[in-house]
């Protein structure tokens, strides 16, 4: 692109800017030049791979904007950046979308559809959405990631590292198969890990029932328990009490009958009130330990006869509390981790009458073939009919749901595969303490989760995922753990006729026949692995670290990762766990935790609510830069962001101001033949005015603060600071001061000094802004910077980060005071009804420290003939803090004609712009009016009007084709024509 070849239209047009810039980047291979290593220090970024199972939305765009800001920042600082992209392309999220697409409702439906076809459908789906993510989640955002070399979790060379991790765990004795109580999704028919469960908590309404268990041998004597899962009573095996709590035998009257209920003594009054029982008394008390051994009759003995065949009794447990319920806890060892451990302690049977799909098996007696959630209601109904239901209500509480399909989870005992995280969590915690987690207020959440980490259930009863690399000898039950595809091929006596991609996926891997280690038939455990293990190995698998050791050692540990707050229990956690297991080290140095993104009403976004904002819609309407700057400016990255699309227009307004400032510079520099290399700042600054030194001081402070904000991930402060500098400091202040100098046709040294200063300021503003808004800054760099500085870097993104120079504090204070005084003066004029364009005789300034220093500037800014220090009580006065400004409450008659002349000038300038005249074009002006005042203003200020509007001819006459205006209640018609050369 020739220097300065891009045009500068009258206003900022995001879509046209994006199109031109993308073409420039493509044609000149700017990204390739940008990402190439030049021997500098390294800054390595690890991409948290988005799952390509749907369209990117504004939540994704928020996080990816933060990533881009940090990467671009360090590249400008001179670092060699590592920006490999990544895609998460397996697991339950993908399967769930395919099931919806194919209208499959269960695992049985998948099997009938065919595992091969289903796996291929999953692969096709992620391919389809990958195209959207490359375009709308990356390119249109301006996010510079290396997508040509992006890692994909589905690829053989990548997922083999999950096998390596499992094999290493096996070698360290950390891989175990165990029978435990776990959370299951009955819809997806698979177990879930603790961190997956933590991702899906949501508030819901559930039954809350109080039930009587009849004491064996007692006369109308009962143990009263409480539960929110009535279906688990089917598998009840005991009732637990705290050994040290006092329990009361309470005599109550129910339906005309006298009964005796055992409850925690401390809870009796509140429970009686809840149950609506007015007549009651405590007849006996015992400590929990004394109740141990008391036998009771299973409340569903008739419905589930198998339970009636063995005794049930009271046991003691330290985990019993008085916070909820009755102080007596119903124990179902197959449906609760604490219940399960208690069963092991007392030798209780672990009954599990519920299958993985939530359906009762033959152990469920009369409930066989029914779903737990249907049985919930049925059990309550049966207990009521038997007179065992004491009280029922609904309760709202946080309960785990499937993090992908949203189904309510169930606890059930099953045999699964685990990595014993409990044995390395102390090391994980120690390594985490070496990591800079931002913000500090959220690192506690991460710390606590790691400190309490439980063994990682890695097996999933699904199809599209990384196969669990564990084979079992059919003859003797020994296990074989395979750590690579090469090892698998070496041990295989028969392989299916497929490529490597299919070979490492179900169902093809299950067709591999292995004969080794004195076993003729090894059968693979029928699981895929937790999808969080897939993304959790990115720290090494992304670059095939074992086969590219030199590269990996330059990258690891990665300098920066960032994702949402839920990833403290998701990706951040799985990265830490796998890395510590494999290397003994944390895989990252800096973790930025992002807040949630909400709709404008503060509600969570969801498809069901219809309030999701899609990236495609946003970018098509507003363009990327306005969306980026809005996201960056609104709140701190770690705070929840309520996204209001209507607010993006304010950002567009600020970017348009930047555009206008650059256009202002281009207009006058072009007229005067400015060349930044001919008029270098170092040589011309001393020829300038004090205001030039002031703006450079403000710039240097801004650069220093901006840099620190970005380094500390305070993007909201950096973006706000940059916007304020552009809009207020540069446009509203410096440019306002500059206009009187550049409008002059005399080629004075201070004018070229002003150009040199303005060019330096704009250049540095664009470089800083390039990390925030990469498209508009590139466009202005090409259209303006390279036009006036031929040897400027080819792209703003290839420029060098500006150093923060020295600054004059006193000068800054003086000018900030000047503009505070000007603000007060403008407010006083407004209250007096005197426009800023209208001159006033004098203004009084009181309480200003530097008033004498900037008197001339205040006269120019405030359109005041004379500025005096002091106060004038008979004038209209406005106070701002310690400052006070007083002005006349009406315009003096002798200044009225000058005011009218200024009004005429404004109208003529508007008409020049409307007719598309260049700033250098000279014009003829005809004014038609019946107003003697207007005529007098033209005659008296003819030279002034002509000079300000570049009019070579100004007459009062009839107008044939003009525009009618109202000036102070007088009708005026004005016609302008370009003067012929």
From Swiss-Prot:
Broad EC category: ligase
Binding site for ATP: 607
An annotated GO cellular component: cytosol
Ranges spanned by the short sequence motif 'HIGH' region, renumbered to the chain: 50-60
Location relative to the cell: Cytoplasm
InterPro entries found in the cross-reference section: aa-tRNA-synth_I_CS (IPR001412), aa-tRNA-synth_Ia (IPR002300), Anticodon_Ile_ABEc (IPR033709), Ile-tRNA-ligase (IPR002301), Ile-tRNA-ligase_type2 (IPR023586), M/V/L/I-tRNA-synth_anticd-bd (IPR013155), Rossmann-like_a/b/a_fold (IPR014729), tRNAsynth_Ia_anticodon-bd (IPR009080)
Keywords in alphabetical order: Aminoacyl-tRNA synthetase, ATP-binding, Cytoplasm, Ligase, Metal-binding, Nucleotide-binding, Protein biosynthesis, Zinc
Entry annotated with the keyword Iron: no
SUPFAM superfamilies: Anticodon-binding domain of a subclass of class I aminoacyl-tRNA synthetases, Nucleotidylyl transferase, ValRS/IleRS/LeuRS editing domain
Chain ranges for the short sequence motif 'KMSKS' region as given in the UniProt record: 604-608
Cofactor requirements of the protein: Zn(2+)
Annotated GO MF terms: aminoacyl-tRNA deacylase activity; ATP binding; isoleucine-tRNA ligase activity; tRNA binding; zinc ion binding
GO biological process per UniProt: isoleucyl-tRNA aminoacylation
CDD domains: Anticodon_Ia_Ile_ABEc
Major site of localization recorded for this protein: cytoplasm
Pfam families given in the database record: Anticodon_1, DUF5915, tRNA-synt_1
Reactions the enzyme catalyzes: tRNA(Ile) + L-isoleucine + ATP = L-isoleucyl-tRNA(Ile) + AMP + diphosphate
NCBIfam families found in the cross-reference section: ileS
Quaternary state and interactors: Monomer.
UniProt comment concerning the protein's domains: IleRS has two distinct active sites: one for aminoacylation and one for editing. The misactivated valine is translocated from the active site to the editing site, which sterically excludes the correctly activated isoleucine. The single editing site contains two valyl binding pockets, one specific for each substrate (Val-AMP or Val-tRNA(Ile)).
HAMAP family: Ile_tRNA_synth_type2
Function: Catalyzes the attachment of isoleucine to tRNA(Ile). As IleRS can inadvertently accommodate and process structurally similar amino acids such as valine, to avoid such errors it has two additional distinct tRNA(Ile)-dependent editing activities. One activity is designated as 'pretransfer' editing and involves the hydrolysis of activated Val-AMP. The other activity is designated 'posttransfer' editing and involves deacylation of mischarged Val-tRNA(Ile).
Protein family according to the UniProt entry: Belongs to the class-I aminoacyl-tRNA synthetase family. IleS type 2 subfamily.
Protein name (record): Isoleucine--tRNA ligase
